[in-house]
């Protein structure tokens, strides 16, 4: 753990292209610089699930793999050091195929399949966050789990939502902060976690790393 003599960091690197994560960091006043993947990096292989892998294990593994890739990127670019933040979000429907991992839809047909699975049911949204405090240490990480209950969706409702384009690029084929909010009856847990970055848990990691932001605290 860091102590009070450790360096303070005025910014972090965000190793994610998610506009929602950028928005959430701005919401709590965290300054960041992008450490986005290169176009040639193989994100699909990192995000591929293993046979019979549980959603919690999957999202934690993928986030740590992203952290390793981000560290390599940082070294290759010879950037000054600051903590590196990575995150990954997935959706799981308990009881369906042993808790099938419902990632980003491949196409409209897959989006329809996922939305029909979630219709009228309660599913889990799991977001893992990893913060690498120094280049020589393992990242500190957490997994936050929330529950989301969907209303019963009609065929027309699903078709219109898919036509909006919003399901694509989002785990579970919906976004809670957009049109997808009209699909949701209730949530239990972290709204920001469902968006892609649980701010309470992430702020605890920032405090540990002594990242400065408006409500930061120092840990002895």
What positions do the PLM features span?
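Residue-level signal for inorganic ion chemistry
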Residues: 25, 63, 88, 111, ...
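Short beta-strand segments
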Residues: 85-87, 128-130, 177
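Anionic-ligand binding region
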Residues: 108, 113-116, 120, 128-141, ...
């Amino acid at each position: 753990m860091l102590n009070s003599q450790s360096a303070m960091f005025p910014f972090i690197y965000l190793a994610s292209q998610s506009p929602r994560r950028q928005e959430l960091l701005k919401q709590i006043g965290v300054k960041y610089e992008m450490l986005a993947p290169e176009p040639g990096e193989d994100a699909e292989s990192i995000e591929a699930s293993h046979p019979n892998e549980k959603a919690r294990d999957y999202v934690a593994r993928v986030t740590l793999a992203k952290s390793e890739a981000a560290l390599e990127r940082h070294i290759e670019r010879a950037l000054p050091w600051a903590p590196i933040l990575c995150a990954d979000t997935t959706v799981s429907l308990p009881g369906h195929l042993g808790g099938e991992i419902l990632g980003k839809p491949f196409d409209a047909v897959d989006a329809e399949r996922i939305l029909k699975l979630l219709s009228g049911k309660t599913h889990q949204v799991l977001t893992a966050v990893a913060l690498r405090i120094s280049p020589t240490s393992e990242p500190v990480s957490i997994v936050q789990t929330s529950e989301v209950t969907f209303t019963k969706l009609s065929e027309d409702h699903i078709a219109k939502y898919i036509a909006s384009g919003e399901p694509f690029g989002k785990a579970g084929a919906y976004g809670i902060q957009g049109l997808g909010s009209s699909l949701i009856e209730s949530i239990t847990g972290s709204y920001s976690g469902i968006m892609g970055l649980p701010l309470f848990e992430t702020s605890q990691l920032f405090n540990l790393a002594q990242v400065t932001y408006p409500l930061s605290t120092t840990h002895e």
